[in-house]
A protein has these predicted regions:
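Sec-dependent signal peptide recognition
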Residues: 2-9
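N-terminal signal peptide c-region/cleavage motif recognized by signal peptidases
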Residues: 14-17
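Cysteine-centric segments in proteins
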Residues: 20-165
């Protein structure tokens, strides 16, 4: 199975599926476990956006420009295919992530956001997406970075604008 553009549906027409409110491309949109809130990550023309809260009225909105290299790419090994986008704000980093077990046939995606205190990356909160139908594009963050003209330099461990060696 090719990794570029792998979209996990996550049945957009099914009842209970989160309707994304992105101006650009939806990376993930899911209901949050144990609440009526929505977690959403979008790829916009200049970078990624993150929103969290009730549908249509998020309590928190953050942005991470492509130039800051906010995507933590899947290294290509391990049981799970995953991707994450990091949104720094006010002494914290909100890391929205999506993952799927690649060894389990028809595995449902999992996702959520981990909140880290900065500096030091101390995990202070972890919020999971509710199981069930929701939308996620596993390789969407990497694809958005590439579409914006960036490539991941594996030797340096960072995103470069333009070509990579």
């Amino acid at each position: 199975m090719g990794m570029r553009g792998v979209v996990l549906a996550v049945a957009l027409g099914a009842p209970g599926v989160v309707a994304a409110d992105c101006a650009g491309v939806t990376i993930m949109a899911c209901p949050v476990e144990g609440s009526g809130k929505i977690l959403e990550v979008c790829a916009e023309p200049k970078g990624f956006t993150y929103s969290f809260g009730p549908a249509g009225a998020p309590e928190l909105r953050l942005a991470a420009p492509y130039a800051k290299g906010p995507v933590i790419p899947w290294p290509g090994v391990g049981r799970a295919i995953w991707s994450a986008v990091r949104f720094p704000a006010d002494g914290f980093a909100y890391e929205a992530w999506i993952s799927v077990d690649r060894l389990t046939e028809n595995a449902a995606p999992v996702g959520g956001v981990d909140v880290f205190a900065m500096p030091g990356d101390e995990l202070v909160a972890s919020i999971d997406c509710r199981p069930g139908p929701w939308f996620g594009d596993i390789m969407g963050p990497e694809d958005a970075m590439a579409d914006a003209g960036y490539c991941w330099d594996w030797a340096m461990g960072l995103w470069r604008e333009g070509g990579c060696p």
